């Protein structure tokens, strides 16, 4: 516990909160070739690698992921939600924030049904989260 004198000399500092999706807080000025402070809810990018990885203990699966070069020139790892996907290298994807708890280093999700990413086929429930169209009656 500091004394009053110590607090007078060096006051308490407010805690700085760190962003959970830092790539979303950076823009890029291609004319000046400089990064800018421009936060956005989604970012467009190009898939540079598509693959699977195994989750942390105690889970076991092959989770689909894509390495994406964003429009702000940052490269991030993003999760591909849903069953089956049509992504390959050079696919243009839309990213949103949101981590995957059992995949270390994966802080972003790919938006299904946007740009080159197809929605999940034969999806009846939670369709809006997976970009699936309403089935014909």
Swiss-Prot record:
Pfam families: Ribosom_S12_S23. Keywords: Methylation, Ribonucleoprotein, Ribosomal protein, RNA-binding, rRNA-binding, tRNA-binding. The keyword tRNA-binding applies. InterPro entries: NA-bd_OB-fold, Ribosomal_uS12, Ribosomal_uS12_bac. Coiled coil: none annotated. The modification 3-methylthioaspartic acid is found at residue 102. Residues 1-57 are annotated as: Disordered. GO terms for cellular component: small ribosomal subunit. One of its GO terms (molecular function) is structural constituent of ribosome. One of its GO terms (biological process) is translation. PANTHER family: 30S RIBOSOMAL PROTEIN S12 FAMILY MEMBER. Part of the 30S ribosomal subunit. Contacts proteins S8 and S17. May interact with IF1 in the 30S initiation complex. With S4 and S5 plays an important role in translational accuracy. Interacts with and stabilizes bases of the 16S rRNA that are involved in tRNA selection in the A site and with the mRNA backbone. Located at the interface of the 30S and 50S subunits, it traverses the body of the 30S subunit contacting proteins on the other side and probably holding the rRNA structure together. The combined cluster of proteins S8, S12 and S17 appears to hold together the shoulder and platform of the 30S subunit. Belongs to the universal ribosomal protein uS12 family. This is Small ribosomal subunit protein uS12. The gene is rpsL.
């Amino acid at each position: 516990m500091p004394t009053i004198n110590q607090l007078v000399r060096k006051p308490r500092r407010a805690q700085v909160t760190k962003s959970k999706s830092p790539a979303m807080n950076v823009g890029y000025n291609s004319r000046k070739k400089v990064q800018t402070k421009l936060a956005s809810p989604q970012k467009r990018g190009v898939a540079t690698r598509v693959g699977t990885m195994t989750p942390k203990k105690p889970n076991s699966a092959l989770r689909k992921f894509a390495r994406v070069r964003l429009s702000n020139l940052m490269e991030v790892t993003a999760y591909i939600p849903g069953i089956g996907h049509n992504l390959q290298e050079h696919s243009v994807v839309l990213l949103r924030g949101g981590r995957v708890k059992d995949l270390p280093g994966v802080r972003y999700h790919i938006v299904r049904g946007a740009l080159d990413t197809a929605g999940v086929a034969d999806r009846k429930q939670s369709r809006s989260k997976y970009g699936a169209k309403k089935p014909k009656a």
